[in-house]
Amino acid sequence: MRAFSNVSRISRVSRVSRVALAAPARTVPLMNRNAMSMMRFYSEDAKASEKAGEKAEEKAEEQNLSAEEQKLKDLQEQLDKKTKEAAELKDRLLRSVADFRNLQEVTKKDVEKAKSYALQKFAKDLLESVDNFGHALGAFKEEDLEKSKEISDLYTGVKMTRDVFEKTLKKYGIEKLDPLGERFDPNKHEATFELAQPDKEPGTVFHVQQLGYTLNERVIRPAKVGVVKED
């Protein structure tokens, strides 16, 4: 009986030992599976976090880009506005310069007209005196000049005075118009009479009754003339 009891005890110990030895073998795969599950969980979680981070970065970049684009848009609008203002200012400036130049031209012409009118009036007043000197010189006879020194000196004095007058007139652009022998020009001459002259060309001036004058090449007094009559 004692021997049987010992055998039974040994048999139980053997079973327990086998169970104990077998248990770790079953536990190891279970631990591996749990570890792998945890690793997979953490890996997926890391990927999700990484994707979330990438999306956040992309969103931030988009926001930054949108802000830069808005800033550029604002700057472009400001530039366009300033460009338009500059163009308007330039246009106004050019118009002002053009108006000023036109005013200068008008003022210059008005001054020239006023000067010309005053000079023309002055010249006309003097022309009568010059004519009188001419008439006086024409009244002297050649034989009287040769006979009398006093008459000759008087003639010389009158002529010198007339020459001074004519020189003064010429200084201001007033020229004598003596058309003797020229073709009659109604713009420069005033025909007081016509007469047939066999030895002269018809339509030409054969006698100057009164000299004409021009001011800066513009007639201020036409010459009074006698014209050869047409056949």
Swiss-Prot record:
* UniProt keyword annotations, A-Z: Chaperone, Mitochondrion, Transit peptide
Q: Which PROSITE patterns match?
A: GRPE
Could you tell me which residues belong to the region Disordered?
Answer: 49-71
Chief location of this protein? Answer: mitochondrion
In terms of InterPro entries, this protein maps to: GrpE, GrpE_coiled_coil, GrpE_head
Q: Which GO terms describe its molecular function?
A: adenyl-nucleotide exchange factor activity; protein homodimerization activity; protein-folding chaperone binding; unfolded protein binding
| Location in or out of the cell | Mitochondrion matrix
- Which terms does the UniProt entry file under GO BP? protein import into mitochondrial matrix; protein refolding
* GO CC annotations on file: PAM complex, Tim23 associated import motor
Quaternary structure, per UniProt, is: Component of the PAM complex, at least composed of mtHsp70, MGE1, TIM44, PAM16, PAM17 and PAM18.
Functional note: Essential component of the PAM complex, a complex required for the translocation of transit peptide-containing proteins from the inner membrane into the mitochondrial matrix in an ATP-dependent manner. Seems to control the nucleotide-dependent binding of SSC1 to substrate proteins.
Q: Which PANTHER family match?
A: GRPE PROTEIN, GRPE PROTEIN HOMOLOG, MITOCHONDRIAL
The family classification in the record reads:
Belongs to the GrpE family.
Q: This protein is called what?
A: GrpE protein homolog, mitochondrial
Q: Which organism is it from?
A: Candida glabrata (strain ATCC 2001 / BCRC 20586 / JCM 3761 / NBRC 0622 / NRRL Y-65 / CBS 138) (Yeast)
Could you tell me the gene encoding this protein? Answer: mge1
